[in-house]
């Protein structure tokens, strides 16, 4: 069964969302991130995707305290991402309660470093974030999606697939936060090219039907955010999804 994972994006301690990765479009939601995580847990969620936006842009995590709070006050497994670029960063993230690490920028700027983490921490603990700001050229976006690499998605995935990668998250940034639906063809291409990778889809999810379609495609997990915060995908929807998936 597909995993359904809510995203909690943090800037300066607040829960926020953007449109297409544009900081100028940022909207803050009046949610305490720890209370929010607890609410997800109370409705059957097992894993949350915690995004340190300050860290992603700075190149070093800035919201370890939020990670510690969620890990300390819930039994959720936390997938932490945002600025994890050094051995010290990843070690501290795990010490603060992260169960998994998702990294993007270091895989672009120091691919051998990221590859070493797959070996050191185990492939179950490490996820590559391979996001694109242009679904045609498929060049990798990093540093909080504010910079573009000359690396292409498929070459990037192949490099780490050859080095033992098991999990890859990918976002078509043009669909993120706009509630226009996921780019299903984008993910189907990834699945076709990399059948051994477990793919986490993120960006554009509107509701249960999108999640079910991803499940039918063979996507490992779907990460959602904006649809929940805007009241389009609510906790009742998630319960409905669980019921549908069980039938």
What are these regions (language model features)?
Residues 19, 138-148, 178-181, 189, ...:
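Active-site-adjacent loop and "lid" segments of alpha/beta metabolic enzymes
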Residues 12-13, 20-24, 94, 98-176:
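Conserved anion-binding
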Residues 74, 78-101, 185-224:
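Catalytic cores of alpha/beta
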Residues 41-44, 94-95, 161, 215:
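Non-catalytic positions within long, well-ordered alpha-helices that form the structural scaffold/packing
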Residues 29-41, 86-91, 148-159, 211:
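Short, acidic/polar
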Residues 3-7, 47, 75-79, 99-102, ...:
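Structural preference for beta-strand elements that scaffold enzyme active sites
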Residues 3-4, 55-71, 85-91, 105-127, ...:
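Active-site-adjacent beta->alpha loops and helix N-cap segments on the catalytic face
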Residues 15-61:
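N-terminal beta-alpha supersecondary unit
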